[in-house]
C-alpha cells in the first residue's frame, strides 16, 4: 500500500471531502517533506458524523457480545497483517523510530482489540435475591454516541485505547485524531472500512480549534473521551459537566523515576532511558523527574551521561535509530527553551541540551538526549511538563524527604522505583500519589493493567476492563416475586 495524495473524512461508512473542500498538509517531522493532504472538517461535517453515529448506535446496541468480539478480533487480525505498513506510516507521520512503532505501537494496538474481545465474552451481569419477595437484576447497557479526541504522540495506539472499548460496549464514535498525526489512523480505516457497520466509527480530521471544539460542545453526544494536555482536558470536563454527560480524561504528567542506592546499575540505566527517551520523551507519563539517592548520585550520573552520549539519534525509518524527531520544530524549540529556563534557575546541563543536526537531521526537529543536574524540586523544570527528552535530576537523602518531593506536584500519572528491596519498593509505591507505579522497569503498557492518573492527570482508567464502566450505564431491574398486591393503599 502507498499513501494517498489526499485523505477524506470517513463518515457514515463513506470517504468524502470536507464540505468546503479545505485540507491540511501532513508533513514528515524528521525532514519536513510533504506526505499527504487531509480533510479539515467543517461544523456541518461534525454534525453529519454525529447523526451517522446515532443511527448506527441505534442498531449496534442490539448486537451480541459474540458479534462484537468477532469484529474486535477481525480488526486485530488486519492490524497484524499490515503491521509493517502501518508502522512505517506511523514513523513517517510522527517521527518516532520504526523499532518502536513496529514492536510497540502497532502490535500493542492489535493486542488491545483482542483484549476487549476476550473481556466481553467473559463478562456477566448479576442477579441478587434480596429476600423471598424481591429479585434484583443488574445490567450494563451501552452509553451511546461518544466523542473521542486523541493527541499526536501515540496516534495509532491511542486510537486502539479509545475505539476498542467503544465497540466492546456497543457504542458508536465520532473520533478525531490530531491534525499533526492523522495518517496511520486513516490508513487503518482504509483497511477496515468494509468490515465496520455503516456509521459505527466516524473519523473527523482537522484542526482542534475547529472540529475539536465542535465535538467538545456537540449536544448530540452522550460521553466525551480525551487524551492530551491538562489545560484542554479541563475545558473538556467543563463542557461535559454543562451537558451533564461523563468524560474520561488522560492528561499531563511530571512523573517521578526513583533510583535507590541498592538498585542494579544496568537495570537502573535501562529504566532511566525507557522513562525519558522512549518516544523522544513525548509521553504523558515520562519519567522526567529523576530522583537519585545521595550516596548513589555521582556514580549514577557518570554512567547516565555515558549512556545518553551514545544514543543513536536519526532517521526514524532506520532500524538502528534509537531516538527520532520531535513532532515539529515548534515543539523542539519549546523543549530547548525549557533547558534555558533550567539553566537560569541554576540547573546545569550534564549532557545534551541542544538541537541535533548531524547526519542529515538539520531539516527535522531533533533534540539531543538531555539531563539537567543540580535541580531542586521547586524549579519550573521540575514542576512543568517539558514533553521531550529532558530529564531533571534531583538528589534525596531518605524516604521521608523523597516522598514529600515526589508528591509535591500537580500531576499524578506515572512513576518508577528502582531498588532490589521489594519491601521498600512496595512501601514507597503505596506512598506515591500516582495512578501507575513501575518497579524495576518503566513505560510498560500491556492491555489488562489499568492506566490513568491522580490529581490533574485525569479521570478514569484505560487499558483495562474497568473502562467499560465508563462506556456503559448501569441498569437495575427490580422484580416482585410474590404475585400479590402490596396492601400499602388498602381501603
Model-predicted regions and their roles:
Residues 13, 27-94, 295:
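N-terminal alpha-helical segment of soluble enzymes
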Residues 34-41, 55-62, 148, 257-260, ...:
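Short, well-ordered beta-strand elements within core beta-sheets of diverse protein domains
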